[in-house]
């Protein structure tokens, strides 16, 4: 498996996890979390989105 295939797989896994996090954020379970946990999950989402964008840019330049 070459590096592009690994990046494609990594992005697919990341995007799947990101989709699940976004879905969780629209539930009552998320809104009932302590404020600090909500803050950290929101930051996690932002970083995951940035990471996904970086992987997409790497693939676009390949």
Regions found by a protein language model. Give the residues of each.
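Extended, charge-rich alpha-helical interface modules
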Residues: 1-62
